Amino acid sequence: MLQPKRTKFRKMQKGRNRGLALRGNQVSFGEFGLKSTERGRLTARQIEAARRAMTRHIKRGGRIWIRVFPDKPITQKPLEVRQGKGKGSVEYWVAQIQPGKMLYEVEGVSEQLAREAFALAAAKLPLSTTFVTRTVM
């Protein structure tokens, strides 16, 4: 699963996830993309599950790009532990997603196959998404 190799600090504050995706909001690598229309966060497991669903449907066909990376650690205290005594240990990693963020891209497959693959991937994700096509200026 995806997670950073090294970080400057092990734990991070919760923070807020506001605004729209100003970067990574267009199809840059492939022909078709899966774009988020909702704000939230994706865990490394969810990103991997969606990738697997797409890869299995496309088979040997095209190429897939993952445009998000889980770089925020989420901590949890163990069950039945009283409050205090410091911050919990890192349990998993998430990518914070703003509306308009491109999640996945695909190239080398038909539009119909790309739509089917993205529908399978979207079913694994906790966000609402939309299918987009590359626009050449």
Swiss-Prot record:
Any one GO molecular-function label of the UniProt entry: rRNA binding
Keyword Cell membrane: no
Pfam families reported for this sequence: Ribosomal_L16
Recorded GO CC terms: cytosolic large ribosomal subunit
GO BP: translation
Annotated keywords: Ribonucleoprotein, Ribosomal protein, RNA-binding, rRNA-binding, tRNA-binding
SUPFAM superfamilies to which the protein is assigned, alphabetical: Ribosomal protein L16p/L10e
Record PROSITE patterns: RIBOSOMAL_L16_1 (PS00586)
Quaternary structure and interacting proteins, as annotated: Part of the 50S ribosomal subunit.
Function: Binds 23S rRNA and is also seen to make contacts with the A and possibly P site tRNAs.
Family of this protein: Belongs to the universal ribosomal protein uL16 family.
HAMAP family: Ribosomal_uL16
Name of the protein described by the UniProt record: Large ribosomal subunit protein uL16
Species of the source: Marinomonas sp. (strain MWYL1)
Lineage, broadest ranks: Bacteria, Pseudomonadati, Pseudomonadota, Gammaproteobacteria, Oceanospirillales
Gene name per UniProt: rplP
